[in-house]
Amino acid sequence: MPSQMEHAMETMMLTFHRFAGEKNYLTKEDLRVLMEREFPGFLENQKDPLAVDKIMKDLDQCRDGKVGFQSFLSLVAGLIIACNDYFVVHMKQKK
């Protein structure tokens, strides 16, 4: 039986490939749909209507309009770090 971490890894891989399809990368539209479906709270809290455009620009280091799996993981890691920072601050406030 997979551990929670193994399940989390599998979920990230499956999510990327579900939105990337056979082409094995995300386009800006793929990324927008993924963000809307998988990170709805993040997008709802963004004040900038161009948030997905800016994220795509940051992730698309080759400037070819494609986001590969490693860049997708960078996005997920950044979001996890931000969530952890928020969590730590709020845990300290509860003490």
UniProtKB/Swiss-Prot annotation:
GO cellular component terms, A-Z: AnxA2-p11 complex; cell surface; cytoplasm; membrane raft; plasma membrane; plasma membrane protein complex; RNA polymerase II transcription regulator complex
EF-hand domain: residues covered: 47-82
Alphabetically ordered keywords of this record: Acetylation
BP term (GO), one: vesicle budding from membrane
Induction: By nerve growth factor.
N6-acetyllysine PTM sites in chain numbering: K23, K28, K54, K57
Cited Pfam families: S_100
Cited InterPro entries: EF-hand-dom_pair (IPR011992), EF_hand_dom (IPR002048), S100/CaBP7/8-like_CS (IPR001751), S100_Ca-bd_sub (IPR013787)
Region span, Ancestral calcium site: 60-71
GO molecular function: calcium ion binding; calcium-dependent protein binding; protein homodimerization activity; transmembrane transporter binding
Keyword Ribosomal protein tagged: no
Membrane keyword on record: no
Subunit: Heterotetramer containing 2 light chains of S100A10/p11 and 2 heavy chains of ANXA2/p36. Interacts with SCN10A. Interacts with TASOR.
Function: Because S100A10 induces the dimerization of ANXA2/p36, it may function as a regulator of protein phosphorylation in that the ANXA2 monomer is the preferred target (in vitro) of tyrosine-specific kinase.
Miscellaneous comment: Does not appear to bind calcium. Contains 2 ancestral calcium site related to EF-hand domains that have lost their ability to bind calcium.
Protein name listed in UniProt: Protein S100-A10
Gene: S100a10
